[in-house]
């Protein structure tokens, strides 16, 4: 099967790159998208999806990959309330399938999504790049959150996984995750996927989990997908449509 080229787009008002800009890139036929205004656990409603679909289709793009439908922390922690959030996730899958979505990306990282210690690290040619320095993660998690959030305010955009609503609850989240071991996190991932698989089969949608980014424990939080053996554990846990 030939590789299909897609381009991630963060949506109107949240991405300086427009769909018209992306249209100029040779070979790109699909937009990797999401509803970035939705918090984890919320249902993506048909009319909300339709609005983005109209924008994407106006430029002749497909929209068959979503990144991401984020997973609520109650599911990752394994709280009794997780079942309702799983039902909401199933409804997201059903609604997205009506628009031709075939792949849903997600992650199972506790509290933080992707983490970098420098968003504008200078490189030799004068450009800048994202950068991660492991020793800086040994400090205060609040300092890291404040650093990332400073760019949210400066550029008037929201970084996925670093939404202000989540950052306001950091202390509360760290307390909730305190008893969650790596083994328990694996169990909770398995529970989540096994609950979703019948709906995924019904809707012909595959779930694509993102590797932990970076692939090391941070601030004492467990991480699952960090190397090749961990990927095999994930496959063994739930082989269908993953």
Where would I find each of the regions flagged by the language model?
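Hydrophobic faces of well-ordered beta-strands that scaffold small-molecule active sites
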Residues: 3-8, 29-33, 63-67, 104-106, ...
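Short, acidic/polar
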Residues: 11-24, 84-94
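Glycine-rich anion/phosphate-binding loops
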Residues: 42-48, 78-95, 185-192
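Conserved, mostly hydrophobic/aromatic
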Residues: 22, 31-33, 56, 96, ...
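Acidic/histidine-rich catalytic cores of soluble enzymes
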Residues: 138-241
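Surface-exposed, active-site-proximal loop segments in enzymatic domains
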Residues: 40-41, 70-87, 112-126, 170-180
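Active-site-proximal loop/turn and secondary-structure-junction residues that shape catalytic pockets
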Residues: 11-13, 37, 69, 108-112, ...
């Amino acid at each position: 099967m030939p590789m299909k080229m897609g381009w991630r787009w963060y949506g109107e008002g949240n991405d300086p790159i427009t769909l018209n800009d992306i249209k100029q890139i040779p070979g790109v036929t699909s937009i990797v998208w999401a509803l970035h205004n939705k918090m984890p656990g919320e249902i993506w409603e048909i009319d909300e999806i339709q609005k983005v679909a109209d924008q994407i289709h106006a430029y002749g793009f497909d929209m068959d990959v979503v990144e991401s439908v984020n997973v609520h922390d109650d599911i990752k922690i394994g709280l009794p309330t997780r079942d309702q959030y799983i039902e909401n996730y199933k409804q997201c899958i059903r609604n997205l399938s009506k628009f031709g979505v075939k792949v849903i990306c997600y992650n199972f990282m506790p509290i933080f999504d992707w983490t970098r210690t420098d968003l504008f690290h200078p490189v030799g040619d004068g450009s800048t790049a994202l950068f991660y320095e492991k020793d800086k993660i040994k400090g205060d998690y609040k300092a890291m959150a404040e650093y990332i959030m400073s760019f949210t305010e400066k550029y008037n955009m929201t970084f996925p996984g670093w939404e202000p609503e989540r950052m306001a609850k950091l202390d509360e989240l760290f307390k909730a995750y305190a008893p969650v071991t790596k083994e328990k996190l694996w169990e909770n991932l398995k529970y989540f996927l096994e609950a979703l698989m019948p709906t995924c089969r019904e809707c012909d949608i595959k779930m694509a989990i993102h590797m932990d980014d970076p692939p090391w424990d941070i601030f004492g939080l467990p991480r699952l997908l960090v190397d090749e053996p961990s990927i095999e554990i994930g496959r063994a846990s739930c082989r269908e449509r993953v």
